[in-house]
C-alpha cells in the first residue's frame, strides 16, 4: 500500500507539480504545529486565477499555476525545513500595458509561461499551547530568483522574510484550529537600483474539523506596503481570502478552495485544488 501511494504522489508531482508546508493546504497562512521528526510532508496542487495583474511587465490575464508544490521535513520535535514554489506558470494574456522591463514576448503573443520562484524556509516552534495560552513559533526564509523577468510573470528577485506564528485550538478535541502570522518581508524593488520595500506580512486562518474525514478551512492572507503611495513597482500591497475544504481518504488529504482577491494589485478570483501526503518516519534526525 505504501509503495502504491508513494507512486501516486510521484505521478502528481511530475504531472502537476510545484504558497505558498506545515502550512495546511489549501491555506497560505502558516500553522504553528510541526510535522513529526523524520517524516516528510509532500504537497502538490494547481491554481486557476482570473484577472492576474503584473505591474512591472504591464500584463494582465488569467494565470494557471501548474504544480504548486511543497516539501516539508521534520528535523526535530520543534524544527521543520520547507521547500516550496511553482513548477510552471501559464498566463493567458488579456491586455498589455507599458512594461518597465524588456520582455521576450512577440508583439502579438496571447500567452506566456515561466518557472515560478522557489522558497527555502525554516519553522521553529517556540512554545507549546497551554489551556490558557497559545502556541508560538517563528518562521524565516528566502525567496530565490528562479523566474525570468523577461517572460512578464515573475520578478527574478531575491527576497527575505520572517514572521511570528500564533496558534490556539478550541472546542471538543481541539476541532477548531485557529492560527495567525505577522511578520516582515524585505522585497527588492525590481525596477530601481539599491531600493527595497519592507512590507508587513499577515495572515489569519482557521480549520474546523467536522469529522475524521472532512474539515472546513478559511483565511485572509496578504502583505501591506509601507511606502508612500503604492510603493515601488512589483512590491505593492496584495491580499486574498480563501474558503475551502479538506477531505481525507486512502492516506491522502485532498483539498479545494475558492479564492477572492482583496486589493487592486491582486488577482480577481480563482480556485485551488491539491493533495497532501504525510510519510511515515523515513529517517532518524541527528541528535
What is the meaning of each model-derived region?
Residues 17-19:
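N-terminal signal peptide c-region/cleavage motif recognized by signal peptidases
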Residues 22-287:
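Transmembrane beta-barrel domains of Gram-negative outer membranes and organellar outer membranes
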Residues 1-8:
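Bacterial N-terminal signal peptides that target proteins for export
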Amino acid at each position: 500500500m505504501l509503495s502504491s501511494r508513494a507512486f501516486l504522489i510521484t505521478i502528481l508531482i511530475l504531472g502537476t507539480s510545484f504558497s505558498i508546508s506545515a502550512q495546511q493546504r489549501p491555506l497560505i497562512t502558516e500553522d504553528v504545529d510541526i510535522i513529526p521528526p523524520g517524516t516528510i510532508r509532500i504537497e502538490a496542487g494547481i491554481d486557476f486565477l482570473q484577472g492576474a495583474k503584473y505591474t512591472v511587465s504591464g500584463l494582465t490575464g488569467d494565470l494557471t499555476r501548474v504544480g504548486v508544490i511543497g516539501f516539508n521535513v521534520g528535523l526535530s520535535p520543534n524544527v521543520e525545513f520547507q521547500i516550496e514554489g511553482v513548477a510552471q506558470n501559464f498566463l493567458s494574456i488579456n491586455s498589455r500595458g507599458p512594461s518597465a522591463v524588456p520582455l521576450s514576448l512577440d508583439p502579438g503573443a496571447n500567452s506566456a509561461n515561466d518557472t515560478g520562484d522557489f522558497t527555502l524556509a525554516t519553522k521553529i516552534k517556540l512554545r507549546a499551547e497551554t489551556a490558557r495560552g497559545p502556541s508560538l513559533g517563528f518562521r524565516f526564509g528566502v525567496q530565490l530568483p528562479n523566474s525570468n523577468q523577461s517572460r512578464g510573470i515573475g520578478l527574478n528577485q531575491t527576497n527575505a522574510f520572517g514572521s511570528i506564528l500564533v496558534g490556539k485550538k478550541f472546542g471538543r478535541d481541539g476541532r477548531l484550529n485557529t492560527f495567525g502570522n505577522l511578520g516582515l518581508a524585505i522585497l527588492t524593488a525590481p525596477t530601481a537600483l539599491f531600493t527595497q520595500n519592507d512590507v508587513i506580512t499577515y495572515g489569519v486562518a482557521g480549520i474546523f474539523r467536522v469529522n475524521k474525514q472532512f474539515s472546513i478551512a478559511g483565511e485572509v492572507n496578504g502583505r501591506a506596503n509601507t511606502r508612500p503611495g503604492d510603493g515601488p513597482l512589483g512590491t505593492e500591497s496584495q491580499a486574498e481570502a480563501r474558503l475551502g475544504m479538506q477531505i481525507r481518504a486512502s492516506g491522502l488529504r485532498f483539498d479545494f478552495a475558492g479564492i477572492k482577491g482583496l486589493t487592486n494589485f491582486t488577482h480577481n478570483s480563482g480556485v485551488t485544488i491539491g493533495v497532501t501526503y504525510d510519510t511515515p518516519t523515513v529517517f532518524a534526525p541527528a541528535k
